[in-house]
Amino acid sequence: MEFLEGPWITFFVRWLHVVSGIMWIGLLWYFNFVQIPSMPKIPDEQKPAISKVIAPEALFWFRWAALSTVIFGLIQAWQLGFLRDGLALGFTSSSAYHMMIGLGMWMGLIMAANVWFVIWPNQKKALGMVEVSPEDKAAAARMAMLFSRTNTMLSIPMSYAMVSAHYPG
C-alpha cells in the first residue's frame, strides 16, 4: 500500500506533531493568559465549575497533547534522519539546522517533563483530586503555576527554534 509508505507517513506524522503542538501550546497560553488571571474575579460560589469541571478536562487534553507532541516530534526526527544530530545540538554534524532544531527539541522535552512530573502532580493536589492539607494544596497550586509560567516563557524560543531551523542562515 503506497499510502502507508514514504511521504504519506512522514506527512501524517508531521501533521500530528503540529496539531498536537498547537493544542498543547494553545492550552498552555489559555491557562496562563486567561484562566489564572481570571480566577480572582470569579465569585467563590462559581469557582467549583472551574476546578471540578473545566480545569480537569483542559488538563487532560493539555498533558496528552504534550506527550503526543513529543512522541510525534521524535518519530519525525527519526524518520527524517536527524534524531541523533538534533539531540546532540548539532555538535555531531556542525549543522545550524541540527543546532536550532535540537534547541527546540530540548526545550520541548523540558516542557513536557514539567507537564508530566511537576505541573500535573501538583494540579491534582490543587484541584482536590488528591487529598492534601490546605497548606499543601496552596503550595501545590503555586508550584504548578510557576512551572506553567516557565513553560510559557520557554514556548516562545522553543517555537522560534523549531520554525527557524528550516530557514538557517
What are these regions (language model features)?
Residues 1-169:
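Polytopic transmembrane helical bundles with strong interfacial aromatic enrichment
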